[in-house]
Amino acid sequence: MEGSAEAVDVLIIGAGLSGIGGACQLRSKCPDQSFVIFESREASGGTWDLFRYPGIRSDSDMYTMSYGFKPWRDSAAIADGDKILSYIREAAAEYDVERHIRYQHRAIAAQWSSSEKRWRVTAERSDTGEQVAISCRFIFSCSGYYDYESGYVPDFTGVEDFQGQVFHAQHWPEALDYTGKRVVVIGSGATAVTLVPTMSHQTSRLVMLQRSPTYIANVPQEDPTAQALRKFLPATWVFRLTRWKKVLFQIYLYRLSRRRPKDLRRFLLGQVRQELGPDYDVAKHFTPRYDLSLIHI
């Protein structure tokens, strides 16, 4: 490999939920291993720092999405984005991870040397424009699957003629006031499911457009089992028992969706009908064309 480069044992790419978690594990279980984290943005937290749209929250329960080494202690199983971000940064502080993060470092190339048995990773600094290199034995890629630069926006014919604001929820305008406005939300995925109910209290009219329906189920924000266990068990036990309950239920639900998809589909759509009443067109607006096992609810 050409040129000098700082040498470490492990390079972690990304300081979000996965990257911080991996760094904490290295600090705890491999204290003799040196590591650096490349983070392209100016702050840690990844998705939970970038996304600022109203109502942002987890669409998975935090007992399974949180770290096994750091119990989730909040009463909300479906947590707001601010709580998740605080949780990630608390973990980073507890394990002294912050000093290992190189902010505004975007990994742009990686080269393997068979003779040296090491990677050489090049990063570009957004603050100075210079390129820096690190040599490492292992790369732990935690960059996620979102394009942080820009969310996907279809080519809508005539959008340039629209006189109002058009923007992607991923890049929510700071201090946006939508009080009394007429708003159209395009899409009915996880973002829309959290965004629309929150905005509906302040807009004069809110319409959500969807290309095709997705499976939706109503679940309590707080887990009733965890709430009951908190009355007589320590927080760590509550976390572990609730976490395993959630994991086993998800395994059961997945297997049920594979073995008896029609029955599970019938049950979920029945729950929707019960929520909306007999006069709502559930077949048109809430009945997906795909099987349950192909995507999360």
Question: What kind of feature is each model-predicted range?
Answer:
Residues 170-171:
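Active-site glycine-rich loop that binds ribose-phosphate moieties when present
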Residues 181-203:
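Rossmann-like NAD(P)H-binding beta-loop-alpha module
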Residues 2-10, 15, 20-160, 175, ...:
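N-terminal FAD-binding dinucleotide-binding subdomain shared by FAD-dependent oxidases/monooxygenases
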